[in-house]
């Protein structure tokens, strides 16, 4: 007589436990990704500020324009920079808001910042 081999299959409860564990792990990863995405946006905004500062100060060093004139025409200065491809995008932070470009208290240097980055650094 031949004995039939019995296949062992996964029960419904075992399958539900596995799916629940996958959901819990996925939720934890998604929660941690939110912080990483925010840090990435802060980094991108800081890099944009640094690039805009470099472009505007190079214009100040090479041209006969004052810092006030450069601030007034910052869009055209950044767009016409030969080593910058998409100048308009540099003048925005990672959230799509305009960067703030102004003179420092002494009036001899530029201060470039993003309101969102400053508010997140205060927290």
From Swiss-Prot:
Subcellular location: Cell outer membrane
Keywords: Cell outer membrane, Membrane, Signal
Keyword Membrane: yes
Signal among keywords: yes
Major subcellular site: membrane
GO cellular component, one term: cell outer membrane
Membrane topology: Peripheral membrane protein
Source taxon at top rank: Bacteria
One Pfam family recorded for the sequence: N_methyl
Signal peptide boundaries: 1-30
NCBIfam families documented for this protein: IV_pilin_GFxxxE (TIGR02532)
Protein name listed in UniProt: Putative outer membrane protein CPn_0818/CP_1053/CPj0818/CpB0847
Annotated organism of origin: Chlamydia pneumoniae
């Amino acid at each position: 007589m031949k004995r039939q081999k019995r296949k062992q299959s996964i029960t419904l409860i075992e399958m539900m436990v596995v799916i629940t564990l996958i959901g819990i792990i996925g939720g934890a990863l998604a929660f941690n990704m939110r912080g990483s995405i925010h840090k990435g946006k802060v980094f991108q905004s800081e890099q944009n500020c640094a690039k805009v500062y470099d472009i505007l100060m190079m214009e100040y060093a090479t041209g006969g324009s004052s810092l006030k004139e450069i601030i007034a025409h910052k869009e055209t200065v950044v767009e016409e920079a030969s080593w910058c491809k998409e100048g308009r995008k540099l003048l925005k932070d990672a959230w799509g808001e305009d960067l703030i470009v102004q003179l420092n208290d002494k009036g001899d240097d530029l201060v470039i910042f993003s309101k969102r980055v400053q508010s997140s650094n205060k927290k």
